[in-house]
Design a protein with these regions (language model features):
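Short, solvent-exposed loop/turn elements at domain surfaces
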Residues: 3-9, 111-113, 281-284, 369-371, ...
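Short Gly/aromatic-enriched secondary-structure transition segments
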Residues: 1-19, 286-306, 451-456
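Alpha/beta-hydrolase-fold serine-hydrolase catalytic core, especially in secreted/extracellular enzymes
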Residues: 352, 356, 411-494
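Substrate-gating cap/lid region and adjacent catalytic-acid/histidine neighborhood
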Residues: 228-423
Length: 494
């Protein structure tokens, strides 16, 4: 493992673009400063700003240059780390794919990575998206150096999961990333507008943060300790007023909202692959992560949370159909609009991505081991439990052993005992790794012994349904499964 890094972004270097240096390592480096109040979902505690490292997984430098996969970790842009992503299997391609140089990267997060504030902006530089700039610095390093690790600098795929997918989209839109990658993978994020913060709102947030910190100039903001910044940032809920999960539309690094780009074609066109898990947007957010939020417990979430739309939602999702269990209802009500956002964005991209294919998937396997210890005994009034294809449950099928956060293991969803992938799950992992690496090499996820995967077209789909076994899901089936026409009508009425 090689560990190139960027210079430490502290003191006068804070709120500025990164610069690069190189060190060789045999173990992972520091994680970037982040909130740690999210239990199993959080990464390890860190206030160390010497964290801008990347990791290289390669099978060697012999033979023809290999495709390159640069991976951006998720975590809402407020937590996460590269250390939990073992790229060894992807580097080999597994039994069905092709050898690939895998590079995982750290980047500044939270208020360290995303802050637009009047005094900083008055310095005349477009540096609100420091985290995106870190990613672009990593991509430039890849272009200059990956050949030494057996990689092809002209065949780079940028991918990520959750916030990593959001950031992949930001780089796809960003003029500053032009020429740095040739394909894109969006895993478990639909990338609609709501994950990006308009500049005016970002400046208001940044000015409020400066006021809360007692700062009246940029020098004061740069002098704040990491501990103080994290304290003010708070946890990612209503009690964390300076937290948001996305990039800032600053007009320069990220010039427009994503769906403006998707519908007008104002992005770099290239082969793309994206999808979500069956219970994305529900699942762990409804049954698990809420108990880690500070503030009042969010256990008995019901359809009443939809305010003016509640009557229509209740009619579409009658509680009786979920055994009168509000937790199970919340999972579906949370997941379906997330799923439908993904379908809408895939449709937009397939319409405007001139000359290049878009591939869509729906990860529906619901029995994978997972890292929330309370999942087997989900707190619900009726005691029901339903295995889930929850947010992040698919990462371990790409990056072997991924377990999220600090629990250290994945747990069987039924027994609660630690376990790894087994049997048909390993076959599914081989297929996904094979598809991802074939896509990285050629822009097409098809290959010998891999499931046939058709390109997505508006109104037809199809989605590759990733399960044991795989199947094909038409656009009409997906629309019906996740009630997309209903959710489109609710968005239109707001």
């Amino acid at each position: 493992m090689q560990r190139p890094r960027s210079a430490t972004c502290v003191g006068v270097r804070r709120r500025r673009p990164p610069t690069t240096a190189l060190s060789i390592a045999t173990q992972f480096a520091n994680t970037c400063p982040q909130v740690t109040e999210l239990g199993a979902f959080a990464g390890p505690s860190s206030t160390t700003e010497d964290c801008l490292y990347l990791n290289v997984f390669t099978t060697g430098t012999g033979g023809r240059p290999k495709p390159v996969l640069v991976w951006i970790h998720g975590g809402g842009n407020f937590d996460g780390e590269t250390n939990d992503y073992d790229g060894s299997k992807v580097a080999t391609g597994g039994p069905l794919g092709t050898p690939t140089v895998v590079i995982t990267i750290n980047y500044r997060m939270g208020l360290f990575g995303f802050l637009s504030e009047s005094d900083l902006n008055a310095e005349g530089h477009p540096f609100a998206n420091y985290g995106i700039l870190d990613q672009q610095a990593a991509l430039r390093w890849v272009r200059a150096n990956v050949a030494a690790f057996g990689g092809d600098p002209n065949n780079v795929t940028l991918g990520g999961q959750s916030a990593g997918a959001i950031n992949t989209a930001a780089n796809l839109i960003s003029p500053a990333a032009a020429g740095l990658f040739q394909r894109a993978i969006f895993q478990s994020s639909p990338i609609p507008n709501q994950y990006f913060l308009p500049e005016a709102a970002a400046v208001t947030l940044g000015n409020n943060f400066a006021a809360a910190a007692g700062c009246s100039d940029a020098a004061c903001l740069r002098a704040l300790s990491a501990e103080r910044i994290l304290q003010l940032q708070g946890t990612p809920n209503a009690n964390g007023p300076f937290v948001f999960s996305g990039a800032i539309v600053d007009g320069t690094i990220v010039p427009v909202l994503p769906e403006t780009a998707w519908t007008t074609g104002a992005y770099r066109h290239m082969p793309m692959l994206g999808g979500t898990t069956k219970d994305d947007g529900g699942g762990n957010f409804g049954l698990g992560i809420a108990e880690y939020f500070s503030g009042p417990p969010q256990v008995a979430v019901t359809v009443d949370q939809y305010n003016a739309n509640s009557p229509a939602v209740k009619q579409q999702y009658p509680l009786a159909s979920f055994g009168n269990d509000p937790q199970l209802a919340q999972n579906r009500i949370g997941a379906d609009p997330f799923k439908c956002d993904a379908r809408r964005v895939l449709t937009e991209l397939a319409t405007t991505n001139s000359g290049f294919p878009v591939y869509g998937y729906d990860f529906t396997y619901q029995n994978a081991p997972y890292y929330f210890p309370q999942m087997p005994n989900a707190a619900s009034p009726t005691g029901h439990f339903q295995p889930l294809a929850a947010h992040t449950s698919d990462i371990q099928f790409v990056f072997q052993g991924y377990h999220g956060g600090n629990l250290g293991v994945n747990l069987d969803q039924t027994s609660g005992q630690p376990r790894e992938l087994q049997g048909a799950e390993i076959t599914l992992s081989d297929q996904i790794v094979g598809a991802w690496t074939r896509f990285a090499k050629t822009g097409n996820p098809n290959g010998p012994r891999l499931p046939t995967w058709q390109a997505f077209t508006p109104g037809n789909g199809p989605f590759l349904q990733q399960d044991t076994p795989n199947s094909v899901e038409t656009d009409a089936q997906y629309n019906a499964n996740y009630k997309c026409e209903f959710w489109a009508s609710q968005e239109a009425s707001q």
